[in-house]
């Protein structure tokens, strides 16, 4: 069996808001009832019912402007996927904190930082512009 490929040199149908009138009709191969309706279209349009007018519109166009402008639900999939990956990342981080990383070193403890600061003040580290310059040694408190 031979498969006939699409001829891409011919115009193709597309519903686009920026190009509202496509060069070809939506339905390429008309059925017998659609052919009869196209013949009836050549007469007065006042003799056509509303359903026949809609059917003629659907032969030419796949979607109306309202249908083209209707929002899609794709954002729900994107938000759901993003939330899945954020949740997975949070689980990996919690696993790492529990099983991979050890306890924090003692130098992160507030008491240790206070002792280290006191030691630096006692040694008068950087007395011109640094930490020791902001400490009042006579009153034993930070300068105001």
From Swiss-Prot:
Alphabetically ordered keywords of this record: Acetylation, Membrane, Mitochondrion, Mitochondrion inner membrane, Phosphoprotein, Transmembrane, Transmembrane helix
Q: Where are the transmembrane segments?
A: 74-99
In the bilayer, the protein is annotated as:
Single-pass membrane protein
Q: Which InterPro entries match?
A: Cyt_c_oxidase_su4 (IPR013288), Cyt_c_oxidase_su4_fam (IPR004203), Cyt_c_oxidase_su4_sf (IPR036639)
Where on the chain is N6-succinyllysine found, per UniProt?
Answer: 4, 35
| GO BP terms in the entry | mitochondrial electron transport, cytochrome c to oxygen
Q: Which residues carry this modification: Phosphoserine?
A: 31, 33
Q: What Gene3D superfamilies does this protein map onto?
A: Cytochrome c oxidase subunit IV (1.10.442.10)
Classify the source by domain of life: Eukaryota
Q: Which residues lie on this side of the membrane: Mitochondrial matrix?
A: 1-73
Keyword field contains Mitochondrion: yes
Q: In which pathway does it act?
A: Energy metabolism; oxidative phosphorylation
**Which of the residues are on side Mitochondrial intermembrane?**
100-144
Q: Name one GO cellular component term.
A: mitochondrial inner membrane
Q: What does this protein do?
A: Component of the cytochrome c oxidase, the last enzyme in the mitochondrial electron transport chain which drives oxidative phosphorylation. The respiratory chain contains 3 multisubunit complexes succinate dehydrogenase (complex II, CII), ubiquinol-cytochrome c oxidoreductase (cytochrome b-c1 complex, complex III, CIII) and cytochrome c oxidase (complex IV, CIV), that cooperate to transfer electrons derived from NADH and succinate to molecular oxygen, creating an electrochemical gradient over the inner membrane that drives transmembrane transport and the ATP synthase.
**Family statement:** Belongs to the cytochrome c oxidase IV family.
UniProt name for this protein: Cytochrome c oxidase subunit 4 isoform 1, mitochondrial
